Amino acid sequence: MAYTQQATNAALASTLRGNNPLVNDLANRRLYESAVEQCNAHDRRPKVNFLRSISEEQTLIATKAYPEFQITFYNTQNAVHSLAGGLRSLELEYLMMQIPYGSTTYDIGGNFAAHMFKGRDYVHCCMPNMDLRDVMRHNAQKDSIELYLSKLAQKKKVIPPYQKPCFDKYTDDPQSVVCSKPFQHCEGVSHCTDKVYAVALHSLYDIPADEFGAALLRRNVHVCYAAFHFSENLLLEDSYVSLDDIGAFFSREGDMLNFSFVAESTLNYTHSYSNVLKYVCKTYFPASSREVYMKEFLVTRVNTWFCKFSRLDTFVLYRGVYHRGVDKEQFYSAMEDAWHYKKTLAMMNSERILLEDSSSVNYWFPKMKDMVIVPLFDVSLQNEGKRLARKEVMVSKDFVYTVLNHIRTYQSKALTYANVLSFVESIRSRVIINGVTARSEWDVDKALLQSLSMTFFLQTKLAMLKDDLVVQKFQVHSKSLTEYVWDEITAAFHNCFPTIKERLINKKLITVSEKALEIKVPDLYVTFHDRLVKEYKSSVEMPVLDVKKSLEEAEVMYNALSEISILKDSDKFDVDVFSRMCNTLGVDPLVAAKVMVAVVSNESGLTLTFERPTEANVALALQPTITSKEEGSLKIVSSDVGESSIKEVVRKSEISMLGLTGNTVSDEFQRSTEIESLQQFHMVSTETIIRKQMHAMVYTGPLKVQQCKNYLDSLVASLSAAVSNLKKIIKDTAAIDLETKEKFGVYDVCLKKWLVKPLSKGHAWGVVMDSDYKCFVALLTYDGENIVCGETWRRVAVSSESLVYSDMGKIRAIRSVLKDGEPHISSAKVTLVDGVPGCGKTKEILSRVNFDEDLVLVPGKQAAEMIRRRANSSGLIVATKENVRTVDSFLMNYGRGPCQYKRLFLDEGLMLHPGCVNFLVGMSLCSEAFVYGDTQQIPYINRVATFPYPKHLSQLEVDAVETRRTTLRCPADITFFLNQKYEGQVMCTSSVTRSVSHEVIQGAAVMNPVSKPLKGKVITFTQSDKSLLLSRGYEDVHTVHEVQGETFEDVSLVRLTPTPVGIISKQSPHLLVSLSRHTRSIKYYTVVLDAVVSVLRDLECVSSYLLDMYKVDVSTQXQLQIESVYKGVNLFVAAPKTGDVSDMQYYYDKCLPGNSTILNEYDAVTMQIRENSLNVKDCVLDMSKSVPLPRESETTLKPVIRTAAEKPRKPGLLENLVAMIKRNFNSPELVGVVDIEDTASLVVDKFFDAYLIKEKKKPKNIPLLSRASLERWIEKQEKSTIGQLADFDFIDLPAVDQYRHMIKQQPKQRLDLSIQTEYPALQTIVYHSKKINALFGPVFSELTRQLLETIDSSRFMFYTRKTPTQIEEFFSDLDSNVPMDILELDISKYDKSQNEFHCAVEYEIWKRLGLDDFLAEVWKHGHRKTTLKDYTAGIKTCLWYQRKSGDVTTFIGNTIIIAACLSSMLPMERLIKGAFCGDDSILYFPKGTDFPDIQQGANLLWNFEAKLFRKRYGYFCGRYIIHHDRGCIVYYDPLKLISKLGAKHIKNREHLEEFRTSLCDVAGSLNNCAYYTHLNDAVGEVIKTAPLGSFVYRALVKYLCDKRLFQTLFLE
């Protein structure tokens, strides 16, 4: 074999040398035959005649681009753009080659004459006449046919047979060959083949990309082949791109893309740039809810791109994809229910294939491989103030780094622009090597070398400067760091320095502030791939203009949206709503857009009075308003007239000018010509006040002016809310809650008695309802104690807000000094005296004030009396009610006394609205004002719910700031704490060194004035703790906010709330205020270890030396961030089954020390036989039920594990009454001033915007009460329930406001130590009759189903009938490497805290979902004033509102209330994940998200004692949510599981087995020990004393998995 191969090789070599003549002849013959075969194959190719005259070089271009054709160049026609015109015929033939012969084909915008000449009778051309050029082209094609026929006639020839069918078809039915309609509206042909095709030759530009897929589907197109012109350079910011091969060019102006030929001026085509870019970049073109057209690029030839669009069935994709662990039928159902959302998500994910694969980008853009886009740095010395256009150029990446790497080696002196330019020119030019000219490796345009050199030079200069600064570690000596930088730049640019400096700052390459400098080396280039993605994203975000509107309106709207597009989250801006609102209100969209951008970026100098710049708010803010001024007169009476009362002012409608300016005329005081008296409020319609708009939707002017306008609007909003509530009460007196009836009063004029008697008398104003049932605001006068009523009055409503003319008087006074409707800002010098607690601010005021010519204003009445008392302590009366006043007194009585003072002293001024401070300075006409306050203590709190109070308006603008850093009150240890809060050294004069102590108490039950007396002043953090202490018998208890500014010798600070409180944190101003009220001692009594205990412990450990020095070092710690490596499903490692009962007992005792030693078997008996003192509301007790009936006690199994679990209790009068007091009585009253109806509507709007999918917000027309819904409800009921409905005829209902009451006999275990000191109350069940449930149960079940279907399930989970596996799947896509804030909202007394406002919110949600108005009204009356009857215990009482624990809407109602509460307070648009279940919730936000004061909002608006706290791990419904780099796993709380193993209600062994099965269902994830370490961390975060628990987790798995072993945990 080897020999044969050797001989063959030798013969081959001889042949190559030509030594063998026979072989030579054979080779020549073979070469001839190959040439013949090649020529024959070439002849078999389709023949194309190229008639137009082109150059030889262009001939090569056409031949190489289309080797599939045999092209004959006749060069018999001279024409413009000859190559492009000839190539168009080749392009058409190339497209038609891809289609099976004879298949029905649509030529979109095609040449029907060319198809007729080819005899293609199966082609239909859509040739719409979009402009005159199309008409001309259509006529030219007809002329070409006539010319062809005339030549045949001249030669006496007939139409060839292959053309005759097409010509016959055109003669008989021209519409079947060509139509004048766009392809989107084409009616098509009547007879089609099985598969229909389409071609589009340079016609895609005029078809909107979003309509293309649907248009193809309407014509049943199988595949569409298309060709269009494009250039990669269009993605640069150049306005001109040339196509040299065909002699054409693109020019771009915004979204307008023009295509023209260089030598032709008439052919100019205009297209949409964004539309063309969509065809280039998009992969999928949706056609329907099921089918989509997928684009695939074929080839690029002579500036023309060929692609095809293939029709795909997406149902095949989804039903063919295997999904692990999902039921097939359930998956189909879910896909069909939410198809639109899932389809859009799938399309978006697929569209990114091209954009994320750089190799694909390089393939379709071959010229762009290894090319980068470099900006050209413009350093023009002219037009410094004008904005210069940005320029870019595309060059080789290798060229860029060759230059940069070389010039980086230059020394500092050698690094000049000239040297850089010289080097760039040298490597670009031709060089001579050994006498031979060599071309440069990089072909860079020489016209760009100077600009490129400047970019390279500046980039290198900044980079070297930054490196030098890093090396020198920013050591600055005689000059500042900023001066060094500018010296370097000046040396580099010499006389060009001012322009360069301005350009560097404008482009933000160097950022300079007063004390800081930042150097940012810009990105040298961007890749073509990045630019393609950027252009594509910007194009798809560009809205489609309404072609039905005029061109001018479309251009304005486009410009407006372009302005808005720079804002964050601009993709969520609803263009349709914005356009509609602008048209309705007559607002220029471009003006609205510019205002919005300026306001959001805080560069406008104005403030919009809405919370967020939504579409409607922006349009409403800029709505043109017509203001009308009411003419008024000012009466001036003589100086001998005495001071008139406010009642006289109202009656006479005149204001005394006595003392207004004294007896002298002041030029500084300018009184408005429009003086408003309180009479203007008399008999004004309530609708006028309630609907009265704010001062302006847009606050303009300086910051002080904006603050004044916001303050005036806040007064109007407060008055509006008070009037709205009175109007509601006067129409429905039954709606007054017994808990709040003391705040209101309703007087019946006809009956001459109080229907609801108010607690106080002498109200200044109220709301009146006349005989026509219209409501007005009236200023009240009295005849003795009786109200003087008008003839038409029917009822008068008053409230605690109407006792005085507070808001009315302040509004009158402030409006009276407005100048042309604008606040007048005083030129007085305002000095802020910022002092630490106890620095002697009041003492300083008394020492500096001259009571003869100065004014002292304080926020509270007690503070004013204290200042007067201290000022007059010497016996000489110098401080009076004229020069020492409260702020409210000064504003309400403005004009009744002296109005001009020399100096103003404002104590605790930072607790006031900044606008109020500005008004006080201006109205006092002082020349200097001193505002005393503490910047670290509690600031002004906006107590009008839903009123906008922008953050930047909260900063008081002053002329000077003085600091007081020596405290006269605080001991040394508190001074040490103050040094951590204030700038500068805080000193003290107190002789007390140590003053703090704390005590952890067992629970609120131990607090008693006898057994636990509290020393000194008693202070609490929350109103609920204050109310509890007052009910226990403690006196003189106040909250921290109430005692700010006061001083006490000894303080007892008390916290009885075990759940986290938001205001108790180290950063909270409440903590600072609470610890700085004493001079001698403070003791903290708390039920939990919190931030206060941590601070006090630290202070107790501070050495005496440090207390003398008052020095604090604060270090900053940084978090190391590590990127994830792998993501997937949970890793499973089976847990070893080890451990014993003693392990579980040990773990329980370590977590809850002492609970296992509690002997509570006879607590219920002790409760019955001992004397009890209970705080009971109005109720009826049947004392015959006080002795429970004797019952046989059931025997239960005894648990081996000792926990705090109790035996089931027996219902009775005392037991049920204690449970009712705990669960239903003494509900909190924390709510502020709330306009219930308007605020509820606003809250529901936020609820729907936050949680519901936009497309599904509209209610469905589905009958809520039907036979099917009733049958579904009955299937879920027990047989006993159905038996109760046997005699129900569904015609009449029992009383819907009557409820039954019972208790759950098994006490609920709490995972804390309260069992050691408290007798836990049982849970109650308040429920309707089954007959009522039979009607409303199916209704709300259907409403709940509709609500859950519309919820955005990808981000929110409403935990209804969910399994632990479903919870894991919901949280599985959380990225553990993305920093997140995990928030939990804990609400105490959730059910009984719900009042009228909560009901209004819930009813509004049900109504919007489609609840019938009649059923809604019946349901509403059944939840307002309700009666509870407990037949077992003999108790009857009345409750207002509250959540009923056994209602048909209990669970879903609680869930939507907590969700609505959170959506009204938190930025839900930034939420990553959120879950809600009853009163439990867990939220995942991006790290660093700003949150408002949750406790304040929950108190004032929702009446909730809410605490929002952050955690590292989520805890939801008794389960720990552990998210890791692979996904998420949910572990059941192991401590809760052990607590259940101590249950004392297990009846027998069968019951025990059922108990074990239920525990296995919820705790199955404990069998996976792969994430035990994470579980240890999560448990340790909640329970500080918990040890590492891997051993007990394994023990739990061991006993739960073994049926026999589990039986040993309980004894007979």
Curated annotation (Swiss-Prot):
| Methyltransferase: annotated segments | 52-466
Q: What is its EC number?
A: 2.1.1.-, 2.7.7.-, 2.7.7.48, 3.6.4.13
| Family matches, as Pfam families | RdRP_2, ToMV_Hel_N, Viral_helicase1, Vmethyltransf
Entry GO MF terms: ATP binding; ATP hydrolysis activity; mRNA methyltransferase activity; RNA binding; RNA helicase activity; RNA-directed RNA polymerase activity
Q: Which InterPro entries match?
A: (+)RNA_virus_helicase_core_dom, Alphavirus-like_MT_dom, DNA/RNA_pol_sf, P-loop_NTPase, RNA-dep_RNA_pol_alsuvir, RNA-dir_pol_PSvirus, ToMV_Hel_N, Virgaviridae_RdRp
Q: Which positions fall inside the (+)RNA virus helicase C-terminal domain?
A: 965-1117
Start and end residues of each stretch annotated as Helicase: 831-1086
For this entry, the protein name equals Replicase large subunit
